């Protein structure tokens, strides 16, 4: 522990006097001259010795120390010095001149005696502060927050003021007053509570933690909104016309602004006091709500917005991306796989297999299965003319892909043969 910083001798005497007065010392050394004279005399001064004993006893009552300062007298100065030395060592005194060196030479100077008094008095003052903080939550006085809240409840209910600070007694008076008031009102005047179960201590602690987390979150949001309010009002003063009225704006705005607190006031008591009607959710845009929230400034800031449309039942359908479907027309076109390719190709369809007006191109056969005069291929035969895969022209008759040459002359034999342009089909020689 660091000792107090020492200045001139007069300043040290003033610090000792101020500390002793704050500690409630009522002895003869509250005068500067008497204190200076006793410090010059040292341990031989009875007033100085009595003050050291008083400070030591007060310190020992607040903390557990083995050493103590009890004896004093001119005949037993050495034992008194030993007690003071042991007491200072146990207190971890930072002044080396008071705890080291020859014990008979330690408290012979006025400055050293003032250091001893200043150390003991400041240590006692620190111990008293710590002791007060320790028992602050257990001992309630009239100025505590709970007493103030209970007293505010008593004032609101008209309970006579009492000098007692007994919280249970005040609460019993409040309870009897509330019951008396409820007997004189309608039955459903207060309503049923929203929370119908009794909370245990564990549930109450959990709700307190939840409320603390929510309060921290909403405090952040409230600070953001308040900052936005400050910036908005500040922007109003940028114009030359408003700069002349800065004082008027501040006089009107600042009292209302300082009344806004970033910390929320919602506690667990609000949950216990909530009624069933609080669970009914009313839309903020409903007619009943807007009767009290609507004002002329909404129309001034926004004005009347024109109708922008956008209703689905009024939107016209988009134009078609594909042409309308049409029924397939009957009759051959230019053939199946080919069209008017080659020589005499093209023409309408006959009774051929793969196509009417020529498969790969040809001059439209009149009949035949895979061949005939108009089948798949061209010329005067489909895939076969008079033979298997060809007649006088496979991929072409007199045009198309070839002349008269196909895969062969009269083919490979009899099957599927045709006469080239006649009755085609499954014809034999």
UniProtKB/Swiss-Prot annotation:
Protein's UniProt keywords contain Chaperone: no
Sequence ranges of Gly residues compositional bias: 332-429
Keyword Disulfide bond: no
Region feature (Disordered): 304-429
Protein name according to UniProt: Protein FAM98B
Any one GO cellular component localisation term in the record: nucleoplasm
InterPro entries, per database record: FAM98 (IPR018797)
UniProt GO molecular function: identical protein binding; protein methyltransferase activity
Localization (cell): Nucleus; Cytoplasm
GO biological process, one term: positive regulation of gene expression
Record's compositionally biased regions (Basic and acidic residues): 305-314
Function of the molecule: Positively stimulates PRMT1-induced protein arginine dimethylated arginine methylation.
Family: Belongs to the FAM98 family.
Keyword terms, alphabetized: Cytoplasm, Nucleus
GN (gene name): Fam98b
A Pfam match: DUF2465
Subunit-level organization: Homodimer. Component of a tRNA-splicing ligase complex. Interacts with FAM98A.
